[in-house]
Amino acid sequence: MTEMSFLNSEVLAGDLMSPFDQSGLGAEESLGLLDDYLEVAKHFKPHGFSSDKAGSSEWLAMDGLVSASDTGKEDAFSGTDWMLEKMDLKEFDFDALFRMDDLETMPDELLATLDDTCDLFAPLVQETNKEPPQTVNPIGHLPESVIKVDQAAPFTFLQPLPCSPGFLSSTPDHSFSLELGSEVDISEGDRKPDSAAYITLTPQCVKEEDTPSDSDSGICMSPESYLGSPQHSPSTSRAPPDSLPSPGVPRGSRPKPYDPPGVSVTAKVKTEKLDKKLKKMEQNKTAATRYRQKKRAEQEALTGECKELEKKNEALKEKADSLAKEIQYLKDLIEEVRKARGKKRVP
């Protein structure tokens, strides 16, 4: 009896923890684990569950879950019929069981999409060979020991929790009665930003939709895997051709700094002005020297002519003086001759 109750509690714990376990997904895996539990049950000693114990059980509050056997002489499968029946999980008090008094209400759509997100990011982790990104624990205050009770849970029963008032006003009323192997399709309009608390890579997906990407798969990669894959790196795929180093120039050599263009232009202008000024000064010097030489030559010529004329004038003066002397001498001579004739006439 103790072994079967332990098996019952273990299966029920697996049922409750399977929505948060990524390894317990899929109907075929659940059925295979169910067969394993049945094989284990064969080795146990057959015991029957009385209807009184089944009615007073805190875990199973249903009268038809266990078939009563008073004799205890049936086979090993007589007490495992309850495993094939459907159970109504609404009767269980999960808040008291898992100590979730302060846990906020979770939307029903997030519980349904949790399995899809696990299947979506599982192949990405295997391809990139990176550590899986740390996801936020949707059960805020659950201890780690309770979460890792059973890594291979056989069933995936989901209990619809009451939604928040703001979420109920914007989404239609869905009555979830999920069975084994059922699929849930949720439109994009029903998905609210609340899913960012459970999926840490939603902001990266939104950024990838804004910028054009090379792949049309629509899967957003994690930052670790994004850095790991060279074909999706933004530095190599969107780098401008100017930023790539030329093959002729080595990477270590840097271009030498040149003078600013303004300084070189002003220096050229200054040198040109200085050259023009020097040329003009030289031209003025040559012109002045030529002018002085010309004036000097003219002056020398004038002085030479003046000297010659002065010499002629002096010569003429001397000649005039000599003539004047001769005239005076002749006058004196004529006067003496008159006087002498006059004396001769007067006796």
From Swiss-Prot:
GN (gene name): Atf4
Renumbered ranges of motif BetaTrCP degron motif: 213-222
Source organism: Rattus norvegicus
Role according to the record: Transcription factor that binds the cAMP response element (CRE) (consensus: 5'-GTGACGT[AC][AG]-3') and displays two biological functions, as regulator of metabolic and redox processes under normal cellular conditions, and as master transcription factor during integrated stress response (ISR). Binds to asymmetric CRE's as a heterodimer and to palindromic CRE's as a homodimer. Core effector of the ISR, which is required for adaptation to various stress such as endoplasmic reticulum (ER) stress, amino acid starvation, mitochondrial stress or oxidative stress.
PTM comment: Ubiquitinated by SCF(BTRC) in response to mTORC1 signal, followed by proteasomal degradation and leading to down-regulate expression of SIRT4. Interaction with EP300/p300 inhibits ubiquitination by SCF(BTRC). Phosphorylation at Ser-243 by RPS6KA3/RSK2 in osteoblasts enhances transactivation activity and promotes osteoblast differentiation. Phosphorylated on the betaTrCP degron motif at Ser-217, followed by phosphorylation at Thr-211, Ser-222, Ser-229, Ser-233 and Ser-246, promoting interaction with BTRC and ubiquitination. Phosphorylation is promoted by mTORC1. Phosphorylation at Ser-213 by CK2 decreases its stability. Phosphorylated by NEK6.
Positions where Phosphoserine occurs in the chain: 213, 217, 222, 229, 233, 243, 246
Family statement drawn from the similarity comment of this UniProt entry: Belongs to the bZIP family.
Region (Basic motif): 276-296
Tissue specificity annotation: Expressed in brain, heart, liver, spleen, lung and muscle, but not testis.
This protein's name: Cyclic AMP-dependent transcription factor ATF-4
Single GO molecular function: DNA-binding transcription factor binding
Biological process according to GO: bone mineralization; cellular response to amino acid starvation; cellular response to glucose starvation; cellular response to hypoxia; cellular response to leucine starvation; cellular response to oxidative stress; cellular response to UV; circadian regulation of gene expression
Record domain bZIP: where: 274-337
